[in-house]
Amino acid sequence: MEGIQISQNVAILIDGNNIERSLEAEYGAESRMINFEVLIPRILRQRGLNRLIYFREGQNISSRLAEKLHSEFHGSVRPCHKSADIPLSIKATQLASKVDTIVIASGDSDYVELVRHLKSEGVRVEICAVENHVAQVLIDEADYYYTMQKSDCFGANLPQQRSVNRRPGTQSRNKKR
């Protein structure tokens, strides 16, 4: 694809509680926070970031996290009354006409209908989740799936790995629309 410039606007919507629980269950308590400086460039792959929103249940939200997302990615943290499912779904629906791609960082099968709806609106939908904590139906419905790795977390003692984008148990895939 030499000489071809792909210009896409991407919104990344993170279900913070789901991802934090998944990372902690998979890698331990010291690795439950996302290292955004590693993960976001891996997801974007030279595409433009339109929005980055971290949805988090409750009022105990780190001001350092909010400041970091705002200063480095012009992102924000949205506190949620209960689960992030409904606020994230509403925001994704609102953004559908403004972006080319929406990345949902969650393994929760509750987002399957949202993925189907966004795709019917012509939006490319990608899922980013921890491999053993993602619903297979969510992977199947998405246009693309990113495995969140230990190297995408703070506290990771492993050397930084390159992108591994695949379904659990399969070779690399990138569905075409």
Name these PLM-found stretches.
Residues 58-171, 175-176:
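Nuclease catalytic cores that cleave nucleic-acid phosphodiester bonds
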Residues 1-84, 94-97, 124, 129:
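Domain-level signal for Mg2+-assisted phosphodiester chemistry and nucleotide/NA-binding surfaces
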